Every structure is written in structure tokens, then in C-alpha cells.
Design a protein with these regions (language model features):
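Von Willebrand factor
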Residues: 155-277, 284, 315, 318, 322-323
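Solvent-exposed loop/turn segments at secondary-structure junctions
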Residues: 7, 15, 28-29, 41-42, ...
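Extracytoplasmic/secreted cell-surface and envelope-processing proteins
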Residues: 17-19, 31-33, 43-45, 171-174, ...
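Acidic, polar low-complexity linker/tail segments
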Residues: 106-162, 168-176, 188-191
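P/S/T/G-enriched low-complexity
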Residues: 303-306, 310, 317-578
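Loop/turn elements at helix/coil->beta-strand transitions in domains of secreted/extracellular proteins
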Residues: 159, 195-201, 243, 268-276, ...
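SH3/SH3-like beta-barrel superfamily modules
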Residues: 4-38, 84-122
Length: 578
């Protein structure tokens, strides 16, 4: 039996000595009928797994017993042998029940159901903790097949590179350098006859025009990807880009507005490789800055980009003028460009002294890797699995990122699906190299639940802002507002935490993550400094914005059976919960 639906249980009873359950696809109590209890599996926490990108890890193996997984964890060399044997003879399922596709990846934007029904902790050969996971039937569900997108229909792997460049007062030499480097790259690409496979775009960003109207724009698409396919057109349009003649109100600029303009404002369809290169000499305005246009923090901006399979690089110009901001900006941009593969770490690179030519070299280095990847794919050159050293170069990291993007593209092109299986054990790490994560853990939320979570966070944020001058009234304010949302205000008044009051939804209870929000109590709130309280609220506010991007991510919402629109499901990364 394969899981075809996610069902809610409304009643259980014994019929002729056998347990049966009354189930329905919707949350409104409507029943679709009865099923033998033996044909369903209890799935209490709605936890699901998503395969991580294939930027160096081996395909995931699904085994019969947890003990077999544990044995391979302790011996990666043996795991490599078992994997090689399984790849050679896929019919032999004595030990390996199923295998993730080898020649391509299961696409990041394809919906498949990989629920966790049980888990236990184990350790790898170095004593590092690893989760052993019992997963049941994997199935893309009953959703109708989606029409092929341009990216799937196209035979060729194409790459889009969008430069998001700070265009404030000091930046003209860097704007000119980026323009010239892109022109040189396009000249080389043209010589290979591959201009249709690599396109460049340009976004400029500045700072608040409310505070400084003379800046003209906060973020703006200066050259679209369609325009940027033509080298002469890119060159002519880039020559028109001028740095502002007006100074911003702060040294930090609105880099996140620039990145989000690229994420949401560019047409990325038709491109398997999707890259943003952020170029700036300043830190970014964060959520807690009243003049920040996005009202998002770096982790949320990164997640919004990943939702569209876009990778962000940060090229940080460490000029003398920005010395005081260097450390803070580096921290921001390392979070913004963080990669799930710990061998990659992040895609941050500093340009010492703000050297114009060094910036050009870095842009050329990254652009060349992706241009070469396109060339290799077009000439059918086999792609070796990336093997990253302990201190990989920018080019090595880029090659691994490009490899993962090409694997994802191949998965979409060949309609690769997650393997079908009834029940199996695996690990949350690559069995052949446990340093690499194999999965991202998500929680399945309905559209109604996500909306409820967002409204609850808004209630908490509003309550905190109303009581800034009298923090002891914070929980009283939440308790009063909770009554309007049919929650339990008495639980909050009795010294309970936000979970006790039911404010953040029972669907968050019991999840395997540490939640600052769920565990917040009146005493803990009062023990925080003003700055810590502000950080807490800013993070919640930033998540509210992120949930809006999830809500608008139409392609990745799925409905089963006759479920209502409000019961559509989305895989929300556990790391993005409050």
C-alpha cells in the first residue's frame, strides 16, 4: 500500500473485532468514510522530509531495519560498498529497499510525501549524533501532474546570473567593473555559440527614499534577464547606470530590498541555474530598522530565494570607509549565503580594501564556473560528483552549487520521482559521509494553519509593541487579545507559556525543535534586556513576512482528494518556525 492521501481521523471503533477509523480529507469534520485501521498509519506531528541538494552527498538509501542503518553509520566504507551494489542491481532489495535517483535529483520544487513515523538517536563513527528515521510510503500524492514549465520543456540547461549592486555614492568604479567583466564573459560565451544558455541581469539598490527622496529608488531592475541575453544590449544599458549623487542617511544600505527585487522581480523561468551576486561595501538594513523596505532578516531573505531555487553570493567590499561595519556585515552575509552542505558553508567572499580589480576577478571566477558548466552540459561532458576539501575555493564551491542545480534540472527534465516504498529506515545524514545532511525536516501545515500562525505572531508582536514601556503588561495584553481568537487566556494569566495558552497552535506542540516562542513565559520575558526583547520581536516580525512568501508560493501548495482550498498543504521548513 502507498500513501495516496493525508487524512484526518474523526472516530475510531471496533467492527467485528477489528479496529476501524472514520476519516476525511478536510479539517471541517466532513467524513469520507471508514477504513480498516491496519490500512492507515498514525502521523501525529505531520513531519516530512525533503531531500537536500546534491552538491556532493551520495544518493539516500532506504533500508529494512534501523539496525542495518546503524551498522552502516559506523562504517562509511561499508556504506559505499552497499550503495555501489544497490546501484548496480536495483532489483536486489534484500538490504536496500529503495534508492534515491542516482543520475538526477528529485526536483526541489516537486511535491512528494515522505512522512516521519518514528525516529531514534544514534551516533556516527566519530560519536556525532545522527537521527535514524522510519519513513513510510513516499508518493507525490493525488495532485494532477503539472504542465511542463519552460525549464522542464527546454532541452538545454540554461543559467541566469543576476548582479544585485549597491548604486550609492561611492560605487561607480565597481558598477563599471561589473559591467566590463560581464561583457568579457559574454564575449567568451559568444565565441562558443552559447549566448542562448547564459543570461545576465542587473538590479540596483540604495536606501530609503522616504528618508532621502533624492536617492530616486530603493531597489530597481536595471537590466532584465531577457534584455541581458544580448551582450551589446547589456553593455549599452549598463553604461547608463550611474551611482547616486546624493548620500544615504546611513552607511548600511537596503541590500535585502535589492535581493528581494531580484528574487520576485526577475523572470527566472526557463533557467536551471539561478544565481544572485550581491555586490556592496556596506551592511544591510535589518528588520529592526524603520527604513528597511522588506522588514525581513537575512535568514528569511535566504529562505525566500531558496523557495525559487536561487543561490545568493555576497561579494563584500571591505573598504576603509566601512571599517566599523565590516564585522557586522560579514556576519549578516554569511547567514544570507549559508548553504545546507557544511562543506560549502556559505557563499560569502570578502574583497580586501575594496580592490576594484579583485572584485572583477571574483565576478569572473564565479561567472566562468557557471559558463563552463553550461558548456560541459551542452557538449555532453560527464559531470564528476564534487569532492570538496576542508577549505574549498570559491570556484570549488561554485562547481558544487552548479552540479546540484544541474542534477535538479535533470530531475525535472526526466520527471524523477522519490522512490515508492511502504516502510523503511534511513538516516538524516549521508551514510557514506555522515558530515553531510541528507534531508531537511519540514512540518506540513494547511493554508488555514499557516494563516492562523501568522495571525498569532502578529498578535504577539502587536502586544509587545503596545507594552514597550511596561513590559510586565505584555502577557496580560496577549491574554486579552487571545480571547478574541478562541484561545485560553486563563492559561497565560496563571503563569503558563505561550504554548499553554494555545496561542501558537497545537500543531506546533511536540515538534522536535527548541522554540523560543512556545516556551516564553512572563518571568522569562521580564528577565530579558530591552535589546533582547526587541530582537525577539524583530525575529517574529521577520517570520510574518516570510510566511507571506510561503502563502504566495502557489506552485508548492498541494491539495489531496476533495480538500477545500484552506486545507491545501505546504512543507514549512522546521527551521523557519517561531
Amino acid at each position: 500500500m502507498c500513501i495516496r492521501d493525508r487524512l484526518y481521523v474523526y472516530q475510531r471503533k471496533d467492527i467485528d473485532g477489528s479496529p476501524w477509523v472514520r476519516v476525511g480529507a478536510a479539517t471541517d469534520g466532513r467524513s469520507d468514510g471508514w477504513l480498516p485501521a491496519a490500512q492507515v498509519s498514525d502521523w501525529k506531528q505531520s513531519l516530512v522530509l525533503k531531500f537536500t541538494e546534491r552538491s556532493g552527498r551520495a544518493p539516500v538509501m532506504f533500508l529494512r531495519q534501523s539496525a542495518e542503518v546503524e551498522k552502516l553509520l559506523a562504517d562509511p566504507a561499508a556504506a559505499k560498498n552497499v550503495l555501489a551494489k544497490a546501484q548496480k542491481n536495483r532489483e536486489d532489495n534484500q538490504q536496500v529497499l529503495a534508492l534515491e535517483p542516482t543520475a538526477s535529483a528529485v526536483p526541489q520544487n516537486q511535491f512528494y510525501l515522505l512522512p516521519i513515523f518514528d525516529s531514534k538517536e544514534s551516533f556516527d563513527e566519530n560519536g556525532q549524533p545522527v537521527q535514524l528515521l522510519n519513513v513510510a510510503s513516499i508518493d507525490p500524492g493525488s495532485a494532477a501532474a503539472k504542465p511542463a514549465t519552460k525549464a522542464i520543456a527546454a532541452d538545454a540547461f540554461r543559467t541566469a546570473v543576476v548582479l544585485v549592486v549597491d548604486t550609492t555614492v561611492s560605487m561607480q568604479p565597481y558598477i563599471d567593473q561589473v559591467r566590463d567583466v560581464v561583457h568579457e564573459l559574454q564575449t567568451r560565451i559568444a565565441e562558443r555559440g552559447e549566448l542562448d544558455s547564459v543570461s545576465f541581469g542587473l538590479v540596483g539598490f540604495r536606501n530609503s527614499i522616504k528618508k532621502t527622496p533624492g536617492l530616486e529608488y530603493v531597489a530597481k531592475t536595471l537590466i532584465s534577464l531577457d534584455q541581458g541575453r544580448d551582450p551589446q544590449r547589456f553593455l549599452d544599458m549598463a553604461r547608463q547606470v550611474k551611482a547616486s549623487t546624493v548620500s544615504s542617511h546611513s552607511f548600511n544600505e537596503d541590500a535585502f530590498a535589492g535581493v528581494m527585487q531580484a528574487v520576485d522581480g526577475m523572470d527566472w523561468s526557463g533557467y536551471g541555474g539561478r544565481i544572485i551576486l550581491l555586490v556592496t561595501d556596506a551592511g544591510a538594513l535589518r528588520k529592526n530598522d524603520p527604513f528597511a523596505a522588506t522588514q525581513m532578516n537575512e535568514a528569511e531573505v535566504r529562505q525566500a530565494a531558496l523557495g525559487k531555487q536561487i543561490k545568493i553570493y555576497a561579494l563584500h567590499l571591505r573598504t576603509d570607509a566601512g571599517k566599523k561595519t565590516h564585522a557586522g556585515a560579514e556576519t549578516q552575509y554569511r547567514v544570507l549565503t549559508a548553504d545546507a552542505n557544511p562543506q560549502i558553508g556559505d557563499l560569502y567572499t570578502s574583497v580586501p580594501g575594496g580592490d576594484v580589480h579583485k572584485l572583477g576577478e571574483r565576478v569572473d571566477e564565479i561567472g566562468t564556473v557557471f559558463a563552463n558548466l553550461v558548456h560541459q552540459v551542452r557538449s555532453d561532458t560527464p559531470q564528476p560528483v564534487p569532492l570538496l576539501s576542508s577549505a574549498p575555493s570559491l570556484a570549488d564551491k561554485s562547481a558544487a552549487v552548479g552540479y546540484a542545480m544541474h542534477m535538479d534540472f535533470l530531475g525535472r527534465k526526466t520527471a524523477s520521482q522519490a522512490p515508492q516504498l511502504v516502510s523503511a529506515w534511513t538516516a538524516d545524514r549521508d551514510l557514506t559521509n555522515p558530515a553531510l545532511p541528507a534531508f531537511q525536516v519540514c512540518v506540513m501545515l494547511t493554508k488555514l494553519q499557516l494563516n492562523d500562525l501568522q495571525q498569532s505572531l502578529k498578535l504577539i508582536v502587536d502586544a509587545a509593541r503596545k507594552t514597550q514601556t511596561s513590559p510586565k503588561d505584555f502577557f496580560q495584553e496577549i491574554a486579552s487579545a487571545s480571547a478574541y481568537m478562541s484561545r485560553d487566556p486563563q492559561a497565560l494569566r496563571k503563569g503558563g507559556n505561550l504554548a499553554d495558552g494555545g496561542l501558537l497552535g497545537e500543531y506546533l506542540e511536540g515538534l522536535p525543535y527548541r522554540s523560543k516562542s512556545l516556551n516564553m513565559t512572563q518571568d522569562l520575558w521580564l528577565s530579558l534586556s530591552v535589546a533582547e526583547q526587541e530582537d525577539f520581536i524583530d525575529e517574529l516580525d521577520s517570520k510574518i513576512r516570510l510566511y507571506e512568501t510561503f502563502h504566495n508560493d502557489v506552485a508548492n501548495w498541494v491539495r489531496f482528494g476533495d480538500a477545500e482550498p484552506g486545507d491545501a498543504l505546504y512543507r514549512v521548513p522546521l527551521s523557519t518556525l517561531p
